[in-house]
Regions:
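Autoprocessing Asn-cyclization modules and mimics
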Residues: 117-183
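Glycine-enriched, solvent-exposed interface loops adjoining structured elements
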Residues: 1-121, 182-329
Length: 329
């Protein structure tokens, strides 16, 4: 879609000889346009919910909630959070890094849910290998490990996680990922049968909550606060100790990946689209947003080349030809 968007943008600009937008400028404008369109989904979702509550929304093909939710859920991911200190769980003391490019591979836009798994079932070392298997001839997995439990290869760098699909026998588990390619790796297993959801509170509120035994977070009703990089879970006690990878799972909406129009340069100096480049990245928004992306990019182009007519044209087209839900309200 990104090449189609760029070709349309250049066609509109060239029609009246407004100027040329370089690939680097286009990529910058494309990033901002996608972020704008992405954030509009959340504000539009709020308006749709309000319309449903007021009984003014449609159904079947007019069900805007369904269409918006499907697009939003494409960006909803689940990741185990990285503990503050891998090697010293006691130092971690319920502190985990929030999702980011360096810890989970995705930048978090909004955290939706935090689930804690406080119970560690067992730990040992594998002494056999097979694809998607954990083999430990000293183990007794039957009656202890259940489907859905979390297995962590602690010796891998970085540590890797997998979910138990099935207990094959007393010494062998079928896993969701092939995380034991060699023998001699240390592992542990966390129970997914015992879990509790944590509620977010503000840093100021947690102080007042902890002052009362009635309102203080407990192992049955935990809470968490967060800053720019870390999440702190409460209560901090011997009955609720979290410090291992696999003990805290976060469902969050990630930011879309930065779009990048990649190219090769011909002898005459003209850039030609080449999606085989390793840093190529298409837009992640659905095809129906192509028009919106074009109009938003044209607005940035108008500012860049100091042609107010381009920006005004794009704004008018966005409002008239394909109004967003927010503009209809």
């Amino acid at each position: 879609m990104i090449n189609s968007v760029r070709n349309t943008v250049l066609s509109v600009l060239n029609k009246n000889n407004y100027g040329y937008i370089s690939p680097s400028d286009f990529n910058l404008f494309a990033k901002q346009a996608q972020l704008e369109a992405y954030e509009e989904y959340f504000s539009n979702y709020n308006k749709v919910v309000n319309a449903e509550n007021a009984r003014t929304s449609g159904s079947d093909y007019a069900d805007l909630n369904k269409a918006i939710s499907e697009t939003m859920e494409y960006f909803l991911v689940d990741d185990f959070l990285q503990p503050f200190d891998y090697d010293n769980p006691s130092i971690t003391r319920n502190r985990f890094y929030i999702p980011s490019l360096t810890t989970t591979g995705n930048e978090s836009y909004m955290i939706n849910r935090v689930v804690c798994y406080p119970t560690k079932l067992t730990d040992s070392t594998n002494d056999g290998t097979a694809a998607f298997r954990l083999i430990d001839n000293t183990a007794t997995f039957l009656g202890l490990v259940n489907p859905g439990d979390i297995v962590v290869n602690w010796s891998a760098s970085p540590p890797q996680t997998a979910i138990v699909y099935y207990t094959l026998n007393n010494i062998e588990l079928l896993l969701s990922a092939d995380i034991f390619p060699v023998t001699g790796d240390d592992y542990y297993i966390i129970s997914a049968q015992e879990y509790v959801e944590s509620e977010k509170v503000s840093a100021g509120k947690i102080i007042s909550l902890n002052l009362s035994n009635i309102t203080a977070p407990s192992s049955m009703f935990p809470a968490y606060t967060q800053d720019n990089t870390l999440m702190q879970l409460y209560p901090i006690s011997t009955t609720f100790t979290l410090g291992l990878l696999g003990q805290v799972k976060c469902a969050y909406f990630r930011y879309p990946k930065e779009p990048k129009w990649t190219y090769i340069t011909l002898a005459a100096g003209e850039p030609i689209f080449d999606q085989s480049q390793p840093d190529y990245q298409d837009f992640e928004l659905p095809q129906e947003d192509e028009f919106k992306l074009i109009m938003k990019i044209l607005q940035y182009c108008g500012i860049s080349i100091r042609e107010s007519e381009v920006a005004q044209f794009a704004i008018a087209q966005e409002q008239h030809e394909q109004p967003t839900f927010s503009q209809q309200q």
